[in-house]
């Protein structure tokens, strides 16, 4: 049944909004790359399986980063897959370094860029503590903001630097690789950086940016709410406020609330059902429950979407637990 939103938009606008052309092009490319295998099952079945995988969010597993970040749906799917695969890290209370979290990301996307992981870690950690340990929940919610709103945050970093230096904030921002978000955090002696910028003026600039930005932006009303209790703020203070804001997490729709981060009963039940079908596997999983949530360190490249998709997405095995705050102690 067609949704009211679908009926309210012209066909071409709806197709563009849902990035249907992106998925059609990818499906055709995979069809051509694997035509010999697909000929055994039929083209109709291939397209059915492909678009089922897109709806289920499993189509991004083990794909190249350019595809993983290509659409908002792909980004949400990747965030959800990362959470489901590695919830056991939070359940067990394990604290990992930035490099270790990056290794986990690369299990799902082999060419995932280190720079994005570093940016997410900077939201959580102090300026001189990039090698310190982080809890799963702290990293995950910071990573969600950094990954999903990446282009928007690059523009925000440029706006912040302009405000800090007294430039006109109404000029068009063209973010570059040298934008403020890529730089080291300021030293403690840099009073101007520590003081930050006026929150109300900063929000006005962000509101104008959201109006003209072609990439995904957090809802302006929620951004205003996140900044409502401060008079001045730093750039990383702003990112931290976004990552901790309940409403922004709900609006993005990729992750559950922090209190429910370790709960996914449907996935756990399905995993148990699948494991029961594999002779000799249940005992080993029972002896080492954390092993079931980690995909292979060298996952195969997905050549055809209909082959591994219905199994790759159900790879998690824990149910309940709690997270720890970021700590510098050794695990």
UniProtKB/Swiss-Prot annotation:
Principal localisation: cytoplasm
UniProt-annotated stretches for the region Required for interaction with TPGS1, LRRC49, and TTLL1: 1-225
Compartment(s): Cytoplasm, Cytoskeleton, Microtubule organizing center, Centrosome, Centriolar satellite; Cytoplasm, Cytoskeleton
Region: Disordered, residue numbers: 289-331
Keywords: Cytoplasm, Cytoskeleton, Microtubule, Phosphoprotein
CDD domains per UniProt: DD_C11orf49
UniProt-listed InterPro entries: CSTPP1
Region (Required for interaction with PCM1): 1-111
List of residues that carry Phosphoserine: 319
Positions with biased composition (Acidic residues): 318-331
Record carries keyword Phosphoprotein: yes
Residues covered by region (Required for interaction with TPGS2): 112-331
Quaternary context: Interacts with PCM1. Interacts with TTLL1, TPGS1, TPGS2 and LRRC49; the interactions link CSTPP1 to the complex TPGC. Binds to alpha-tubulin.
Xref: PANTHER family: CENTRIOLAR SATELLITE-ASSOCIATED TUBULIN POLYGLUTAMYLASE COMPLEX REGULATOR 1 (PTHR34252:SF1), UPF0705 PROTEIN C11ORF49 (PTHR34252)
Role according to the record: Regulator of the tubulin polyglutamylase complex (TPGC) that controls cytoskeletal organization, nuclear shape, and cilium disassembly by balancing microtubule and actin assembly. Regulates the assembly and stability of the TPGC and thereby modulates polyglutamylation of the microtubule, which antagonizes MAP4 binding.
Membership in a protein family: Belongs to the CSTPP1 family.
Protein name in UniProt: Centriolar satellite-associated tubulin polyglutamylase complex regulator 1
Organism: Macaca fascicularis (Crab-eating macaque)
């Amino acid at each position: 049944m067609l949704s009211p939103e679908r009926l309210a938009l012209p066909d071409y606008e709806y197709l563009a909004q849902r990035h249907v052309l992106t998925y059609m092009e990818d499906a055709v490319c995979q069809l051509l790359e694997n035509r010999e295998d697909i000929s055994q099952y039929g083209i109709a079945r291939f397209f059915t399986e492909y678009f089922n995988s897109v709806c289920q969010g499993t189509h991004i597993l083990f794909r190249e980063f350019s595809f993983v970040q290509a659409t908002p749906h792909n980004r949400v799917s990747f965030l959800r897959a990362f959470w489901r695969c590695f919830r056991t890290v939070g359940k067990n209370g394990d604290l990992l370094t930035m490099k270790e979290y990056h290794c986990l990301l690369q299990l799902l996307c082999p060419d995932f860029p280190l720079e994005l992981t570093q940016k997410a870690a900077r939201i959580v950690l102090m300026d001189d503590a990039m090698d310190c340990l982080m809890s799963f929940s702290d990293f995950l919610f910071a990573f969600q903001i950094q990954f999903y709103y990446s282009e928007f945050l690059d523009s925000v970093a440029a706006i912040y630097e302009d405000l800090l230096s007294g430039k006109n904030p109404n000029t068009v921002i063209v973010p570059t690789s040298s934008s403020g978000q890529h730089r080291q955090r300021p030293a403690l002696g840099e009073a101007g950086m520590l003081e930050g910028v006026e929150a109300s003026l900063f929000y006005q600039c962000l509101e104008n940016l959201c109006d003209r930005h072609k990439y995904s932006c957090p809802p302006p009303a929620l951004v205003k709410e996140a900044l409502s209790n401060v008079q001045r703020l730093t750039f990383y203070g702003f990112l931290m406020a976004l990552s901790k804001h309940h409403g922004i997490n709900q609006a993005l729709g990729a992750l559950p609330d922090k209190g429910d981060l370790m709960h996914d009963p449907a996935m756990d039940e399905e995993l148990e059902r699948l494991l029961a079908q594999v002779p000799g596997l249940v005992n080993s999983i029972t002896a080492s429950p954390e092993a079931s949530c980690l995909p292979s360190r060298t996952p195969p490249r997905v050549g055809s979407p209909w082959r591994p998709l219905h199994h790759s997405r159900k790879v998690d095995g824990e149910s309940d637990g709690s997270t720890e705050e970021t700590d510098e102690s050794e695990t």
